[in-house]
């Protein structure tokens, strides 16, 4: 999937890729795609045809479609190496391929996802945004069990997320974005009959964000808000939990919706799908999501994207 995406003409015009992964495996795939590969450490041209630098990491299990403990360790090693490179200022953006949280955890490391790892590595408060052609929806919580959602929502944090979302999109839109905020419960709580998180937490957070200059409304019942995505009275939605956001984003445009991490000093994007082990090594997986993620990373690394990040990179408070 990665090799096919990097061979795409639009991607080759847009960026110079540096691949963090298993060298021999990628070199073999790159040869099939006629992608030029340069040795690790070789200076890459700032312009011209895209070239690929393969980072040498210890060889791991190379059995496509077969999850292994060593494979989990390798996935984490590749992600960590890419993040370290970004921290050193060696790359302008990060585009992460899917990894298996289960296999990484089985390898002995509790891994909740790229977004959480990046927040910790950069020491920033971040926000996950599913950026699609028809709807943009951010997540107030990421990988949180349903039973833990009520205590995961906090007024000041929600207000800060709304500020981050507004500041991130304003340079792109040229104005303050209109943000619609979902409720947590069915029918946004129905006035407290179906839960009171909207009354106790979400509505006060919206009021606080509005006092800070954010154009936001809600809490709205999610089913009604997403019923007509092409006529939504907002530029972006803040959803309260993972599936409230991702079901809509994937249903509307699975292949072209990109996962963007807001709040980092460098852009980070990812395709909106998982590892798909059943398709690994068969050439059947669509490269369109990875192409979309790569092009979005290049766009966010542009001067306008850099201006947006300068306005939104907020250090996380030290404990």
Roles of regions detected by a PLM:
Residues 1-113, 156-240, 244-269, 273-275, ...:
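Contiguous, glycine/small-aliphatic-enriched amphipathic segments in soluble metabolic enzymes
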Residues 117, 128, 137-139, 268:
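Conserved hydrophobic/aromatic beta-strand scaffold that supports enzyme active sites
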Residues 105-128:
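Glycine/threonine-rich beta-strand-loop-alpha-helix active-site module
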Residues 130-160:
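Ligand-binding beta-strand-loop-alpha-helix segment within the catalytic cores
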Residues 56-59, 124-127, 131-134:
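Flexible glycine-/small-residue-enriched beta->alpha junction loops
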């Amino acid at each position: 999937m990665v090799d096919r995406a990097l061979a795409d003409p639009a991607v080759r015009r847009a960026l110079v890729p540096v691949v963090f992964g298993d060298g021999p495996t990628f070199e073999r795939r790159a040869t099939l795609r006629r992608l030029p590969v340069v040795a690790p450490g070789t200076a890459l041209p700032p312009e011209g045809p895209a070239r690929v630098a393969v980072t040498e990491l210890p060889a791991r299990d190379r059995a496509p479609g077969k999850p292994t403990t060593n494979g989990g360790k390798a996935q984490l090693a590749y992600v960590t190496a890419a993040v370290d490179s970004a921290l050193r200022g060696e790359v302008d953006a990060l585009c992460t391929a899917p990894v298996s949280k289960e296999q990484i955890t089985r390898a002995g490391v509790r891994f909740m996802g790229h977004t959480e790892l990046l927040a910790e590595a950069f020491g920033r408060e971040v926000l996950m945004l599913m950026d699609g052609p028809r709807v943009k929806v951010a997540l107030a919580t990421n990988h949180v069990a349903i039973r833990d959602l009520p205590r995961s929502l906090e007024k000041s944090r929600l207000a800060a997320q709304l500020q981050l979302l507004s500041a991130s999109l304003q340079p792109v839109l040229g104005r303050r974005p209109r943000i619609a905020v979902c409720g947590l419960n069915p029918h946004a709580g129905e006035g407290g009959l179906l839960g009171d998180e909207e009354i106790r937490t979400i509505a006060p957070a919206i009021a606080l964000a509005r006092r800070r200059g954010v154009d936001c409304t809600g809490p709205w019942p999610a089913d009604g808000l997403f019923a007509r995505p092409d006529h939504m009275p907002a530029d972006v939605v803040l959803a309260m939990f993972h599936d409230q956001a991702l079901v809509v984003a994937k249903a509307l445009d699975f292949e072209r919706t990109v996962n963007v991490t807001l709040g980092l000093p460098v852009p980070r994007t990812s395709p909106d799908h998982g590892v798909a082990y059943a398709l690994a090594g068969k050439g059947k997986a669509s490269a369109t999501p990875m192409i979309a993620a790569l092009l979005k990373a290049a766009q966010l690394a542009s001067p306008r994207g850099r201006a947006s990040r300068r306005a939104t990179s907020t250090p996380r408070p030290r404990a």
